[in-house]
Design a protein with these regions (language model features):
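Conserved "landmark" site that anchors the functional core of diverse proteins
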Residues: 1-282
C-alpha cells in the first residue's frame, strides 16, 4: 500500500519525533517542527503518536492513493480537497484507490501535516524517518513520482476530529531567560520582552530569524561554542535574534539570551508574522 506523489509542493518532508539524545555524536534532533500536529494527525488515524507523517510547507502537495487509506491533515489551516471536493482538515478522511488528496496554500499557519493509517515507513536512519535539512540525513524530500510506502494499520480509528489551535498572525510565546542573558544589557532584555519581532523570509527549519531592534551586548568578545537546544534564542554578532528550530546544529558560538518554551507555535509562523516573547520563570 502506498501514496504516490503527483506534486510535492515547495518542500515536503517525512518527519516523526526525530533523533533525540544523539548530540554527543554530532547529530541534531530534527523531527516534526509542529509536534502537536504530528500527534493529532496520528491520533486521528489510529497510529501511535510517533509514527512518520508528511510535513508540507505552503500549498501544492498532491498525492494519489494506490489503495484505500485513512488519512488526516492537521497543522496549518486552508483549502484541502479530495478529487476536487473540498474537505475539512483536522478530521478523518477516507481515500479510495485513485483518489487525489491536494493541499492548497494555507490561510493560517505555514506547515501542513499529513498522517496516514499505518504511518509512512521509509528506511529509518539512526532510529528515525525524519529528514534533517541541515545534515541531509534521512529520507530525501519528496519528488514527483515517489511511492510513499505505508505500514499496516495499527488499530481502529477512535476520533473523528481534533480542534484547531492556530490563531492570528501575532504569536505570543513564553521564554526562559539564559543561559547567556548576562551577555546583554538590561535594555536589551527589556527590548526582547517588550517589542514585537517580525519573521524574516529566510527562516526555515534550522532557525526562525527575527527582524526588529538590535539587542545590545554588555560583554564583547567571542563565546566558545557550547551545546544548544531547539528553541534557543541566539543573538548574532549583528544583534539579531534567531530562534533555533528542529534542524539546528548541536553547538553554537552565539550567546543564547533565552530559550522558547512553546516551540511548536513557531512552526506555523509565516514571513511577516509578528512574534512576542513573554517571560517564564524556570
Amino acid at each position: 500500500m502506498s501514496l504516490r506523489v503527483l506534486e510535492p509542493g515547495p518542500l515536503t518532508l517525512v518527519q516523526d519525533r526525530g533523533r533525540p539524545g544523539l548530540a554527543d555524536l554530532g547529530v541534531g534532533p530534527s523531527g516534526a517542527f509542529d509536534q502537536r500536529a504530528l500527534h493529532a494527525a496520528n491520533r486521528l488515524v489510529g497510529n501511535p503518536e510517533g509514527c512518520a507523517v508528511l510535513e508540507a510547507v505552503g500549498g501544492g502537495l498532491a498525492v494519489v492513493a494506490t489503495a484505500p487509506h485513512v488519512v488526516a491533515v492537521t497543522g496549518a489551516v486552508g483549502p484541502v480537497s479530495v478529487d476536487g471536493r473540498p474537505v475539512a482538515s483536522g478530521r478523518v478522511l477516507s481515500l479510495r484507490r485513485g483518489d487525489v488528496l491536494r493541499l492548497g496554500a494555507p490561510t493560517v499557519g505555514m506547515r501542513w501535516t499529513v498522517g496516514v493509517g499505518g504511518g509512512f515507513v521509509p528506511e529509518p536512519v539512526l532510529g528515525s524517518r525524519s529528514f534533517d535539512t541541515m545534515a541531509a540525513l534521512g529520507p530525501a524530500p519528496l519528488s514527483p513520482g515517489d511511492e510513499l510506502v505505508v505500514g499496516p494499520p495499527h488499530g481502529a480509528v477512535s476520533l473523528e476530529s481534533v480542534p484547531a489551535y492556530l490563531a492570528a498572525a501575532d504569536v505570543g510565546v513564553g521564554v526562559v531567560l539564559g543561559p547567556r542573558d548576562d551577555w546583554f544589557t538590561p535594555a536589551a532584555i527589556t527590548t526582547l520582552l517588550s517589542c514585537p519581532w517580525r519573521v524574516d523570509p529566510v527562516s526555515d527549519r534550522i532557525g526562525v530569524r527575527l527582524e526588529g531592534p538590535l539587542l545590545e551586548r554588555a560583554r564583547l568578545g567571542e563565546l566558545e561554542s557550547e551545546p544548544v537546544v531547539r528553541g534557543s534564542i541566539q543573538v548574532t554578532s549583528s544583534g539579531r535574534p534567531v530562534v533555533l528550530g528542529p534542524d539546528h546544529p548541536v553547538t553554537g558560538g552565539y550567546p543564547v539570551i533565552g530559550v522558547v518554551v512553546d516551540t511548536d507555535a513557531l512552526a506555523q509562523v509565516r514571513p511577516g508574522d509578528l512574534v512576542r516573547f513573554h517571560r517564564r520563570r524556570p
